[in-house]
Amino acid sequence: MLLLPLSVLLLLTQPWRSLGAEMKIYSQKTLANGCTLVVCRPPEGGLPGRDGQDGREGPQGEKGDPGSPGPAGRAGRPGPAGPIGPKGDNGSAGEPGPKGDTGPPGPPGMPGPAGREGPSGKQGSMGPPGTPGPKGDTGPKGGMGAPGMQGSPGPAGLKGERGAPGELGAPGSAGVAGPAGAIGPQGPSGARGPPGLKGDRGDPGERGAKGESGLADVNALKQRVTILEGQLQRLQNAFSRYKKAVLFPDGQAVGKKIFKTAGAVKSYSDAQQLCREAKGQLASPRSAAENEAVAQLVRAKNNDAFLSMNDISTEGKFTYPTGESLVYSNWASGEPNNNNAGQPENCVQIYREGKWNDVPCSEPLLVICEF
């Protein structure tokens, strides 16, 4: 009877892992020999005893070493797409790609601004007459032309309306003295004359009445001066209006100089003669202001003009007609060059923009006189 408790106690003192193995061994031994552990009676004809009660749970054993990692599991399915992250920095510039094919030509661009007006070309030879064009619109009224030949008297027309007063004309020449008029009324007393020579002392005369004050003569002189000043002012105003009328529309005034043109086109020598007959000379601009005044007349007539300067005496040395050297010049680029297919260029023309060029003196150009 004591062997059973001892067997149970022996089992409880064994580790759990070895317990299972021992139990398996004991089971096998029991099958081989039922009384190996428990001896009750001789094996012959004896019955096995009842199972004993389970023993108490033993103390927890020490934590074993970690096992070797198992094989990696299969990759799971991709999760849903996350929110779009912030824009990353630009990457470095890539290598330039190959040059593409030339594209088709683009549409024509807008017309550019008009360029500067070039210098006037040389006058070409007269071409053949063209076919008459259609009748144009009535143009503006032109300036007064030269007086024509007197025609035969026409029939008397209807009386026209009274015209507007004309501009003040130039002072006319003195006419023939008319017949003497009737004697007018006596005028005011004239100014006192100069004193005469001192005479001999005469006899004392009677005491006369008190004379008038000498201030009357002074006041009369002042009044006369005031009248003369008024007349002078009226003459100056009239001359100013006359000067404007003479200059309009083909004249320019700069300082004390007046530049005037009648629109004539002549050679250099004929142009000089025309200005001399008008008591002037060919235009001789001596400053930028005078040069611009001449250029304005050139633009108004749309024709280049002669200037008075030339190098007829000494090639390459341009002077005024008096022989004086130039004090101002405005040559175009590359001028003067004396280059006209062998024909000397000894005279000066002024372009519309005010630049100068040397030309043959025989070329017909606009005449502008200086007064």
Curated annotation (Swiss-Prot):
Per UniProt, the ranges with Low complexity bias are 113-128, 170-191
Disulfide connectivity?
A: C275-C369, C347-C361
Gene Ontology molecular function, alphabetical: D-mannose binding
Quaternary structure and interacting proteins, as annotated:
Oligomeric complex of 4 set of homotrimers.
Choose any GO biological process term that the UniProt entry carries and state it.
positive regulation of phagocytosis
- Residues in C-type lectin domain copies: 273-371
Q: Which residues form the Collagen-like domain?
A: 46-216
Compositional bias of kind Basic and acidic residues = 51-65, 198-210
Q: Where is the composition biased (Gly residues)?
A: 139-148
User: From which residue to which does the signal peptide run?
Assistant: 1-20
What the record says about family reads: Belongs to the SFTPD family.
What organism does this protein naturally occur in?
Bos taurus
Q: In what tissue types does this protein appear? A: Highly expressed in thymus and liver.
Q: Which Gene3D superfamilies match?
A: Mannose-Binding Protein A, subunit A, SFTPD helical domain
Q: What is this protein called?
A: Collectin-46
Question: What are the annotated GO cellular component locations?
Answer: collagen trimer; extracellular space; multivesicular body
Which UniProt keywords are listed? Answer: Calcium, Collagen, Disulfide bond, Glycoprotein, Hydroxylation, Lectin, Mannose-binding, Repeat, Secreted, Signal
Principal cellular location given in the protein's record: secreted
Q: Which Pfam families does this entry report, sorted A to Z? A: Collagen, Lectin_C, Surfac_D-trimer
Q: Which InterPro entries match?
A: C-type_lectin-like, C-type_lectin-like/link_sf, C-type_lectin_CS, Ca-dependent_lectin, Collagen, CTDL_fold, Surfac_D-trimer
**Gene name per UniProt:** CL46
